[in-house]
Amino acid sequence: MGNKPTIAISHLGCEKNRIDSEHMLGLLAEAGYQIDGNEELADYVIVNTCSFIQEARQESVRTLVELAEANKKIIISGCMAQHFQEELLEELPEAVAIVGTGDYQTIVDVVQRVENGERVKAISTTPTFIADESIPRYRTTTEGVAYLRVAEGCDYRCAFCIIPHLRGNQRSRSIESIVTEAQQLADQGVQELILISQITTNYGLDLYGEPKLAELLRELGKVDIPWVRIHYAYPTGLTSPIIAAIRETPNVLPYLDLPLQHSHPQILKTMNRPWQGQVNDSIIERIKEAIPEAVLRTTFIVGFPGETEEHFDHLVNFVQRHEFDHVGVFTFSAEEETPAYQMSPQVPPDIAQERRNLLMEVQQPISIKKNQNCIGQTVPVLIEQENPQTGQLIGRSPRFAPEVDGLVYVQGEAPLNTIVPVQITHADVYDLYGKTNLKNDTAFGETLN
């Protein structure tokens, strides 16, 4: 039997998609396939697509068309495959297989069938699979960072969101399964673990009958990983036990990613998030009171159907009042198969874009003030890269999550994928700058200061 084909992957979309990519690569590598980082040289290219909003679909389509024009054999996976399976197979004869969001664990069988001349469609109507610690992973992040999925799918039905249609209802892994994988990652030298799902604060509700994030955090506190970061915390799910677990578990960073989406009760009601409008202020105040050093990231949608200037002004005042550390702003994207697609009045795209730009301008002085407060402090920094031309080190402090927040640019020497003390010397809107301070090298996995 000849050599097995080489396979490359083009990863698009979110961290959840990244984990799917890593599991597919892990399964293929385990089965003896060679993983090639060069798409031009690989026999097959898996394109793990995103379909969350129009912009993401356009990026996925561009990637697919470029590969098709290069006459590559394409395996399409991910959310766009789940969403537009028939259209993709019809429009792209170069697509030799299409794999749904609940079927990526079959990738070895898919490739084998393709090798035998079959054009494969492996898509479950309702995704139900979630990978556990027994499914191999070929990690694509830097050595010191790993994402850890605690649950898949979503039981909520926000009016703008197509995710439940693409990834199914929530299904949680057991605490034991998650902790076992965390230990595996610790053994690989991971310094930062990022917990993800659609709604991390709802973790365990489907499996145990009640949310179990607080218990999970305390168990992860026993694993030798210096930083544990929480993403996708639904604001109304931040209960007192969860806040206490964050405060009392040394390796859990006081960093919360809270996708609030809006502040005005009427818009939140239209978004089908009505309960949130009554608790936004109180939740944020409660977090800051319980965890004064908390770093808060949030995202907002502007231009949602029916959003008036009054609604937008409410959001601007909300951002000014609470002074979030990091803010992301998206313009509304009308997605078919969501209630918001048919809602009226739709906000003109130019007005939505203008509101986005204005809200980002409002946030900028807040962001730079937060960063300038770090000047003079010695903070822990996870060193992830080195500029080969200048020798400058690049990393992140606990204030910064990968890809969405800023970076710390460091003068001095330190090994990659280690956490070292860095004295911050100056700051700009998004990033910090400093120099290594290796005389002060204790307990930096435990605090933000």
Curated annotation (Swiss-Prot):
Cofactor: [4Fe-4S] cluster
E.C. number: 2.8.4.4
Occurrences of domain TRAM (ranges): 372-438
Transmembrane segments: none
Reaction catalysis annotation: L-aspartate(89)-[ribosomal protein uS12]-hydrogen + (sulfur carrier)-SH + AH2 + 2 S-adenosyl-L-methionine = 3-methylsulfanyl-L-aspartate(89)-[ribosomal protein uS12]-hydrogen + (sulfur carrier)-H + 5'-deoxyadenosine + L-methionine + A + S-adenosyl-L-homocysteine + 2 H(+)
Ligand binding ([4Fe-4S] cluster 1): 14, 50, 79
Gene Ontology process terms (BP): tRNA modification
PROSITE patterns per record: MTTASE_N, MTTASE_RADICAL, RADICAL_SAM, TRAM
Any one GO cellular component localisation term in the record: cytosol
Cofactor binding notes: Binds 2 [4Fe-4S] clusters. One cluster is coordinated with 3 cysteines and an exchangeable S-adenosyl-L-methionine.
Domain Radical SAM core: 140-369
Keywords: 4Fe-4S, Cytoplasm, Iron, Iron-sulfur, Metal-binding, S-adenosyl-L-methionine, Transferase
Family membership: Belongs to the methylthiotransferase family. RimO subfamily.
Purpose: Catalyzes the methylthiolation of an aspartic acid residue of ribosomal protein uS12.
Protein name: Ribosomal protein uS12 methylthiotransferase RimO
Organism: Rippkaea orientalis (strain PCC 8801 / RF-1)
Gene that encodes it: rimO
